[in-house]
């Protein structure tokens, strides 16, 4: 029996898989599997998606008797010469540090795998995960923002810190084609637009990484007919927030709306309510009727779901919310400003939060897009939006 006088990092308890009929405690190689109390407490605090990642890695370790290809030491020294705790196995964005001998496998620690979190030189190498982002300046995007103000928005939100749970009052899910550095400031801008009076000084970003345009589009389709890994991960985060009684104000942009919609549907399928949670969706690629139905069923409060520029093809056409001939014509003429990378971001009808047609027209004129501004002015009276 373990002595309670030992620190939690050295107290061992049997490790059990939390589902009926599946135990890691002893396998055919005859080794018992233990975990330190400290590591077990860390494990219990993870959300369900993270736990499954850990148990999947543990299953592989146990099946190999602790001496498989997942063992770091096996590549550099014989088994008999292995030091006690040099074995590390990856479980998603987590690392497991474990020890092994002829009788036991011991999970010594679980923690973030710092080599796979954070910005990467190649955006497609980034992983989905949570980051706490802090405000660096008081610059906020409004109808009065000048071109100079807009240029400073990229510095308004600063360093991102990888975390394993949402502990801030606000959280966000970014859209497609965003690397982590872009997502951290852009979703801060959308957060301000959605919850202006809160004047948030920090928020948690659930980073939806980009794998390239084609793969991102495939992921959007996947969440409309099935469920992507990112949506499943977000569903576990929502459940974790609810379990810990944390009322979070969410904001989602573009593909983030599709992911959030599907995640809530997955939560609904489990019979779990999300009372206390709030969401605002900006320029979402999701079908609004489907999202509204899912949110109502979950008890989720919708703060805003209609912040869409009528010239933006993402919510109107890709989201299937307005397939009228006039909508198709409007979106067609402005599509190049959505997908083009050389245009100032304030000229895009999609990137920044939609504030008003007058604001959009002003930015088009200031940046020399006179033809587009005239087209928008012609449509303005018919649309009835100022």
Model-derived segments and spans:
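Extracellular, luminal, or virion-exposed ectodomains of exported proteins
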Residues: 1-21, 26-31, 37, 121-154, ...
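Long, compositionally biased low-complexity segments enriched in polar/charged residues
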Residues: 10-12, 17-19, 156-161, 165, ...
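Long, charge-dense tracts
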Residues: 11-112
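Active-site catalytic motif of lipid deacylating hydrolases and related acyltransferases
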Residues: 77-151, 155-247, 286-289, 294, ...
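Short, surface-exposed basic-aromatic patches at helix termini and helix-loop junctions that form
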Residues: 192, 242-243, 264-274, 294-301
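Gly/Ala-rich beta-loop-alpha elbow adjacent to hydrolase catalytic centers
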Residues: 252-256
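Hydrolases whose catalytic domains are alpha/beta-hydrolase-1, hotdog thioesterase
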Residues: 259-263
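Short, flexible loop segments at boundaries between secondary-structure elements
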Residues: 273-297
């Amino acid at each position: 029996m373990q002595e309670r006088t030992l620190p939690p990092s050295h107290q061992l308890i049997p490790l059990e898989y939390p589902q009926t009929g599946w135990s890691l405690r002893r396998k055919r190689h005859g080794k018992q599997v233990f975990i330190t109390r400290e590591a077990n407490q860390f494990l219990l605090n993870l959300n369900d998606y993270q736990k499954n990642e850990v148990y999947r890695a543990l299953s592989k370790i146990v099946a190999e008797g602790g001496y498989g290809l997942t063992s770091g030491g096996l590549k550099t020294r014989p088994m008999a010469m292995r030091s006690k705790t040099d074995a590390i196995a990856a479980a998603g964005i987590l690392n497991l540090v474990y020890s092994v001998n002829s009788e036991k496998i011991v999970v010594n620690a679980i923690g973030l795998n710092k080599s796979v979190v954070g910005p990467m030189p190649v955006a497609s190498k980034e992983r989905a995960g949570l980051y706490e982002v802090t405000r660096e300046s008081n610059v906020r995007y409004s109808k009065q923002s000048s071109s100079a103000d807009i240029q400073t928005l990229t510095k308004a939100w600063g360093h991102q810190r990888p975390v394993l749970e949402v502990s801030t009052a606000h959280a966000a899910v970014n859209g497609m084609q965003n690397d982590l550095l872009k997502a951290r400031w852009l979703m801060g801008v959308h957060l301000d637009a959605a919850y202006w009076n809160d004047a948030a000084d920090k928020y948690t970003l659930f980073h939806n990484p980009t794998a390239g345009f084609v793969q991102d589009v495939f992921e959007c389709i996947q969440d409309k007919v099935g469920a992507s890994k990112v949506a499943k991960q977000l569903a576990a985060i929502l459940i974790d927030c609810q379990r810990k009684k944390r009322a979070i104000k969410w904001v989602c942009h573009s593909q983030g709306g599709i992911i959030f919609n599907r995640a809530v549907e997955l939560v609904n399928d489990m019979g779990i309510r999300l009372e206390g949670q709030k969401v605002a969706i900006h320029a979402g690629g999701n079908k609004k009727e489907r999202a509204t139905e899912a949110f109502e069923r979950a008890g989720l409060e919708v703060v805003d779901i209609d912040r869409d520029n009528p010239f933006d093809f993402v919510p109107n056409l890709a989201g299937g919310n307005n397939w009228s001939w006039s909508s198709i014509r409007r979106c067609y003429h402005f599509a190049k400003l959505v997908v083009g990378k050389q245009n100032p971001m304030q000229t895009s009808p999609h990137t920044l939060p939609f504030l008003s047609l007058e604001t959009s027209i002003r930015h088009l004129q200031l940046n020399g897009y006179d033809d587009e501004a005239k087209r928008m002015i012609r449509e303005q009276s018919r649309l009835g939006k100022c």
